[in-house]
UniProtKB/Swiss-Prot annotation:
Lineage, highest ranks first: Bacteria, Bacillati, Bacillota, Bacilli, Bacillales
DNA-binding recorded as keyword: yes
UniProt-recorded name of the protein: Replication initiation protein
UniProt entry tagged with the keyword DNA-binding: yes
An example molecular function term from Gene Ontology annotations: DNA binding
A GO BP entry: DNA replication
Annotated function: Essential for replication. Binds specifically to a 60-bp region corresponding to the putative origin of replication of pXO2. Also binds nonspecifically to single-stranded DNA with lower affinity.
One Pfam family this sequence matches: PriCT_1
Cysteines paired by S-S bonds: none
Superkingdom of this protein's organism: Bacteria
Keywords: DNA replication, DNA-binding, Plasmid
InterPro entries, per database record: PriCT_1
Gene: repS
Length: 512
């Protein structure tokens, strides 16, 4: 079984039939035995199988007549489409069918038709950092390394796979979906705190890149998560944010960045045009309902409008839509806009909304072009920061500048200047940190400090083969004992596909 097949079967959690009902390549005996098994009642419940959806190319997701694709109801059919399909729904639906217009328009990929939730996917539209930074962000946040990372045209998609599927029912008003959405949103925000262009508004259970031989850059088969542990982690994240929805954003400690001092966007013509629109389409990926509400909420944030009042305003806007969102989803979008990661609505997104719905252009737009972008707190505002905050900065700096090298070398002066950190603080951080690997070359003023992170070292080790790889990983397990499970999996993993030439033997690691 190859890596792609392992990944797909792991994600689907037996939510589809094993074999195709027609034209299967499997033997008759295998098909008969499998059908007998699938017809059994397990734990008092029917062994129900569902469907997923795929599209041949990205453009099919936003076709004028609806999403164009194929409905698949067996693992065999899914594997037949590997390399041919661009996107899929990794979470399984109860059924799928086609529209009546004869253009292979697919129908059924809605939340209330979800059968089971298999995984959470984070979409990052940037390659301005090495892939290892994703693992470093997760580890630095006290969370686990992803199950799988796919490389896309513009960036990466990060998969966190559940150890077993969470089944959806309409009991208690689809409570599993609500809980899963909070987990998904908190995962996105965790990465958005450190990495650029994390998509915070795309459908949590929609279409994502389908795994293929070409796009899998990391896969740890055993690195799966229980829904319960993710729920507990998500609740802690929500508790840390505080009960911000009842405070004015300027007074709330939840806001890390104050709104920009510009003319209020709520007073501009485009805001009045967008908020009056009722035909915002759910099928528009870049100018749909989520993006409209997010853009309007950011304008409210920039205008120093209280978050409670923004909630009411967006609820009213949503209710006026021809196809409104759920109230809980609107609330989540507003909270993301008020999270402090952004300062105002961005011109590009405003223009896209106006052009899509025929309202002209935002000619009176005044906001700076750098907005709708995460802004870190200025160092001058963090003079008395704790050592672990400096540690996070160093890890981010190393990850962003690694260029797939296992170790980066600096003099202490160079590092202090790059991070604007006092030398005494730097020494304290490097002494206390269990997440940064340090080695020193030379003596005195000419000495250079080599620094690395676990993500950088794992990526380097996985480039090697056989005993050399095992030797490196055993050494890393000694350096970072808490990550033993991940490193054990890495010893047999061969899916880190690197295009660059292998680097020389890492100083300080055994020669193997």
């Amino acid at each position: 079984m190859n890596t792609v097949q392992k990944a797909i079967e792991l994600i689907l959690h037996k939510g589809l039939r094993k074999y195709k009902s027609k034209n299967s390549k499997a033997g008759l005996v295998s098909i008969a035995n499998q059908e007998k098994f699938e017809s059994k009642v397990l734990n008092g419940k029917k062994n129900k199988k569902g469907s997923i959806f795929i599209t041949r190319k990205k453009e099919d997701l936003r076709a004028k007549f609806g999403t164009r694709g194929v409905v698949l109801s067996s693992e065999e059919a899914v594997l037949d489409h590997v390399g041919q399909a661009s996107h899929w729904t990794p979470n399984v639906y109860n059924f799928g069918t086609y529209g009546q217009n004869g253009l292979r328009t697919i129908v059924g990929h809605t939340e209330k038709n979800l059968q089971q939730i298999n995984c959470f996917v984070i979409d990052i539209d940037s390659k301005s950092f090495p892939m290892t930074a994703i693992n470093d962000v997760a580890l630095n946040a006290g969370f686990g390394v992803p199950t799988m990372i796919l490389e896309t045209t513009k960036g990466y998609q990060v998969y966190y796979v559940l150890d077993k599927a969470v089944y959806v029912s309409n009991n208690k008003n689809f409570i599993a979906i609500k809980s899963a959405k909070r987990i998904s949103q908190n995962l996105r925000e965790m990465f958005a705190d450190s990495l650029p262009n994390v998509d915070l508004t795309c459908n949590h259970f929609g279409f994502f890149r389908m795994p293929s031989v070409q796009n899998i850059v990391m896969f740890f088969e055993e690195n799966v998560y229980t829904f319960k542990e993710l729920q507990e982690w998500s609740k802690r994240q929500d508790d840390n944010k505080g009960n911000e929805q009842f405070h004015n954003v300027i007074e709330s400690p939840f806001a890390k960045n104050a709104p920009v001092e510009q003319p209020k966007q709520m007073d501009e013509l485009w805001f009045k045009q967008v908020i009056s629109c009722t035909n915002v389409s759910p099928k528009q990926t870049k100018a749909g309902r989520n993006n409209a509400i997010f853009t309007l909420s950011l304008a409210c944030f920039q205008s120093q409008y209280a978050i409670k009042d923004t909630m009411d305003l967006m609820d009213q806007f949503n209710s006026n839509l021809e196809q409104p969102l759920e109230h809980t989803e609107v609330r989540g979008i507003v909270m993301s806009a008020y999270s402090g990661k952004y300062q105002a609505a961005h011109k590009d997104y405003i223009e896209r909304l106006l052009q899509t719905y025929g309202m002209g252009q935002a000619s009176a737009f005044r906001a700076p072009s750098v907005l709708w972008k995460k802004h870190k707190k200025q160092r001058k505002d963090r003079v008395r920061s704790h050592w672990h905050e400096w540690e996070a900065d160093i890890i981010t700096f190393l990850s962003m500048n690694s260029n797939n090298k296992p170790v980066l070398y600096f003099t202490q002066s160079e590092l202090c200047e790059a991070l604007n950190v006092p030398r005494s603080t730097l020494n304290t951080v490097l002494k206390k940190s269990t997440k940064i690997y340090k080695t020193v070359e030379g003596k005195g003023k000419t000495a250079k400090t080599g620094l690395s992170t676990l993500g950088m070292l794992i990526a380097f080790a996985l480039k090697e083969n056989g005993k050399r790889r095992e030797s490196y990983l055993n050494y890393l397990q000694g350096l970072f004992p808490k990550t033993g499970n991940i490193l054990e999996q890495a010893k047999t993993s061969n899916v880190m596909e690197e295009q660059e030439t292998l680097y020389g033997i890492l100083e300080g690691l055994p020669a193997g």
